């Protein structure tokens, strides 16, 4: 009988997989086993903030400390990196997916309008904001959904200030994670961060006014990295292509 099962990966292939810094040993083992079952001969793991830093062009092997915040879909990763290691870190399960849920719940609560997660995502993209005052605000956005009172289709206009209100608690949680990571950062690295500032990566970094809000609470410069959506993927690819250079940054 012909075996119709085929591995997705050639047996000799090495694989570098990005994982959250707050992952448990059980979760880490599950990731590794999944890769091995897929056919990977050698599996390396790299933490998301480390990959984001590499993909953002930060010299992670340098002695100077750099802080990066990677706001992805499921988690927000905050890390201070120096000499190829993570000196301090904080991971919270508040990121893009949670922001979408916040918007969906806000629409139900404040407007009696039921919307789906894809619609919430579009609201976030079009009028999402972390602050209630923007110098260059986006135009109001028309939202379509189901009226919870009458059960019929309905549309309303929503502005960025409403979205900022909807996201406030989740943004607070991200700010708390940043402050916690800063509070346990060694003094020498804190001095470096004071000079270089904080780097923002991931899809959440594109939320309007988030950089200003983090700047306000930390009193540090905040920079959105170039092409933040691909920073983690780009950094993981760079680590894979340069395993000799970045071997110490990955784990078996």
Task: Show which residues each predicted segment covers.
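Nucleotide/phosphate-binding catalytic cleft detector across ATP-hydrolyzing
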Residues: 1-71, 79-198, 205-252
